[in-house]
Amino acid sequence: MSFDVRRFDIYRKVPKDLTQPTYTGAFISICCCVFMLFLFLSELTGFIATEIVNELYVDDPDKDSGGKIDVSLNISLPNLHCDLVGLDIQDEMGRHEVGHIENSMKVPLNNGHGCRFEGEFSINKVPGNFHVSTHSATAQPQSPDMTHIIHKLAFGAKLQVQHVQGAFNALGGADRLQSNALASHDYILKIVPTVYEELGGKQRFSYQYTVANKEYVAYSHTGRIIPAIWFRYDLSPITVKYTERRRPFYRFITTICAIIGGTFTVAGIIDSCIFTASEAWKKIQIGKMS
């Protein structure tokens, strides 16, 4: 007696002439196919799309930077001449630089009565400050007007990624034109290291920051202190990491199989219930007629 492998077939075939098509079954089949197509396209879209997961940890992500952070500053002072505007930098490592001019540019505004300062410079990864003032001017003005608009203040590499909302330029658009002309402005910054990791594993380093500010007119025993625009910064020990991820292929296949199998099973149960109820109703009607 030869062994017949067909005995293991769990998908036994029923001759077509023994099946009975119904309008209800056709309707359920069409709805079933449309439903499966909709779910398949939804899962395919989710599989192709990249999701961004964020996490927090304590570490310095950019150890190769040499302990430096690049800063980009763009600020307009519409009532202060460019000859008077300067940038000073100092920190807890002993750095004290007055009138920083490297990689900076001054653009006259309002027919020379105002100035837009654009500069790129580096700061050490220690608490410190940089400030826009008239300290580097040859002759100090009597009443410098420090009203201003901050167009940009950003730290680290430029990071513009869709679906990532962050405070990379938190002071961009800050308008202090209606402030007291003789007031100093203190911006207290907490810089947060940020890492963005792409699907291929490439990492980009940047910095977000939170800000609090105050405005005041300062005095000493000798009289009023020359106003300035201060940016006092400190670094957060917490790093924010954004990681691009895509759903694994095996999960996509598992979900598709579940959609197809589950839909066919539920549709078969519904069709069977409707058909059984219909046949029972027909028998009841025949019994009443007889």
Curated annotation (Swiss-Prot):
One of its GO terms (cellular component) is Golgi membrane. The chain crosses the membrane at residues 28-48, 255-275. It comes from the Eukaryota. GO terms for biological process: endoplasmic reticulum to Golgi vesicle-mediated transport; retrograde vesicle-mediated transport, Golgi to endoplasmic reticulum. The keyword Transmembrane helix applies. InterPro entries: Erv (IPR045888), Erv_C (IPR012936), Erv_N (IPR039542). The keyword Chloroplast does not apply. Keywords: Endoplasmic reticulum, ER-Golgi transport, Glycoprotein, Golgi apparatus, Membrane, Transmembrane, Transmembrane helix, Transport. It is a multi-pass membrane protein. Belongs to the ERGIC family. Possible role in transport between endoplasmic reticulum and Golgi. This is Endoplasmic reticulum-Golgi intermediate compartment protein 1. It comes from Danio rerio (Zebrafish).
